[in-house]
């Protein structure tokens, strides 16, 4: 182990490495509160995630019998995956959250019409974590407004750079 890695671990810094991002979620939804959840995975899934074969773009989470499950996320099995189990790419995966967090999320989803959307999948100290966000769907005019604001910010930066360069 190198000196830098030893120093980082000695200082208590948690190393996080992003596995998959859901960039479409920011475009399709207004994201509000974010939660970090663990995932109940099988062995072949962890191995496939280490190989970078995870996709959370089509995924969403829902509450069933007081527990939260991730639906639609795809973990493609490796060819040399376990022979004694049949890997299912898009199976329901249980999310591990504290009871208070589950209750809070459940109330917002049921009463206020929020959706649970996965935004990032990453390693946190040798454990796979999923960041989920409470989200409300954007309508087309909201998406157009966001694009217009983004273009305006870009143009403004361009004008400021040009002005500062000439001055």
From Swiss-Prot:
Q: Which GO MF term does the entry hold, naming one? A: RNA binding
Keyword Secreted belongs to the record: no
CDD domains hit by this protein: SmpB
Which stretches are tagged as biased composition: Basic and acidic residues? Answer: 139-158
Localization, per the record, is: Cytoplasm
Show the Gene3D superfamilies listed in the entry: 2.40.280.10
Q: Provide the alphabetized UniProt keywords.
A: Cytoplasm, RNA-binding
Q: Which InterPro entries match?
A: SmpB (IPR023620), SsrA-bd_prot (IPR000037), SsrA-bd_prot_CS (IPR020081)
Q: Its GO CC terms?
A: cytosol
Main location, first listed in the record:
cytoplasm
Q: Which PANTHER family match?
A: SSRA-BINDING PROTEIN (PTHR30308:SF2), TMRNA-BINDING COMPONENT OF TRANS-TRANSLATION TAGGING COMPLEX (PTHR30308)
The record ties this protein, via HAMAP family, to:
SmpB
Give the protein family: Belongs to the SmpB family.
State the protein's name: SsrA-binding protein
């Amino acid at each position: 182990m190198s000196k830098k890695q030893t120093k980082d671990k000695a200082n208590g810094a948690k190393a996080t490495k992003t596995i998959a991002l859901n960039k479409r979620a920011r475009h399709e939804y207004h994201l509000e509160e974010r939660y970090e959840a663990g995932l109940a995975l099988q062995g072949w899934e962890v191995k496939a995630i280490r190989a970078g074969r995870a996709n959370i773009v089509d995924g969403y989470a829902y509450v069933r019998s007081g527990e939260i499950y991730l639906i639609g996320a795809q973990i493609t099995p490796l060819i040399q995956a376990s022979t004694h189990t049949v890997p299912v790419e898009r199976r329901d995966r249980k999310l591990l959250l504290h009871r208070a967090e589950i209750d809070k999320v459940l109330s917002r989803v049921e009463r206020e019409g929020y959706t649970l959307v996965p935004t990032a999948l990453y390693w946190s100290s040798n454990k796979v974590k999923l960041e989920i966000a409470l989200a409300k769907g954007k309508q087309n005019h909201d998406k157009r407004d966001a694009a217009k604001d983004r273009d305006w910010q870009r143009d403004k930066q361009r004008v400021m750079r040009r002005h500062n360069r000439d001055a």
